[in-house]
């Protein structure tokens, strides 16, 4: 059944406090307020579902005399990567908008991600996107992309080449602009790939075999 790391059972600790605060944090040495844990340094980050539900906590604990200074950054990045992979897996049949912090930093753990239906309904997203667009967990399923940006999804599709490879500048109703990359569902990509191939196949001439003289073959 595991061990309880509530404050009542273990004193102040990173796991229990991260669950309550819903944010990454570190607790070191005497901050645990429990003599038995006074030698520890703990860094923890909560993990949320694409719908904003708290799923658990990722924690790194060790002897504070040997703990590297970047532990909190490491556990925070790892939690973000888990959340992002969860979105990619759960919403592979939906459209996704990825928001890199810079145009050349596509696919980093820090980028925001929103999952959408083809009609523009926002189905879920990661914490970065929720904070960037001021989205609450209660908004999922009722929020539309048109509530966030005046630029239609169809216009994002029409610009540039392959949608999943094209980073575009997108305006927001707030007056800001963001970098965005539209990724279609696996099914939609297959359909569009087939449509793109049909004109090419239709225009490709089929080589004609030279006529064969049947009588000449009897000689």
Report residues per predicted region:
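Intrinsically disordered, low-complexity polar/acidic regions
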Residues: 1-22, 28-41
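Juxtadomain coupling helices with adjacent low-complexity linkers
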Residues: 8-12, 16, 20, 24, ...
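PAS-family sensory/regulatory modules and their coupling/dimerization elements
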Residues: 30-31, 39-44, 148-205
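AAA+ ATPase active-site-proximal loops
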Residues: 202-219
């Amino acid at each position: 059944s595991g061990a309880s790391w509530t404050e009542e059972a273990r004193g102040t600790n990173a796991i229990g406090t991260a669950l309550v605060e819903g944010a990454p944090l570190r607790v070191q040495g005497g901050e645990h307020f429990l003599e038995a844990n006074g030698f520890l340094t703990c860094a923890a980050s909560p993990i949320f579902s694409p719908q904003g539900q708290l799923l658990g906590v990722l924690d790194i604990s060790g002897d504070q005399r040997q703990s590297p200074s970047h532990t909190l950054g490491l556990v925070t990045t790892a939690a973000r990567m888990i959340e992002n992979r969860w979105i990619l897996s759960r919403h592979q049949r939906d459209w996704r908008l990825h928001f890199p912090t810079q145009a050349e930093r596509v696919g980093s753990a820090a980028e925001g991600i929103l999952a959408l239906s083809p009609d523009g309904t926002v189905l879920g997203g990661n914490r970065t996107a929720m904070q960037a667009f001021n989205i609450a967990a209660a908004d999922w399923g009722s929020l539309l992309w048109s509530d966030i940006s005046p630029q239609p999804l169809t216009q994002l599709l029409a610009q540039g080449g392959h949608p999943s490879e094209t980073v575009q500048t997108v305006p927001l109703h707030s007056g800001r602009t963001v970098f965005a990359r539209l990724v279609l569902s696996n099914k939609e990509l297959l359909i569009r790939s087939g449509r793109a191939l049909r004109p090419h196949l239709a225009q490709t001439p089929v080589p004609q075999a030279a006529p064969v003289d049947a009588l000449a073959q009897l000689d």
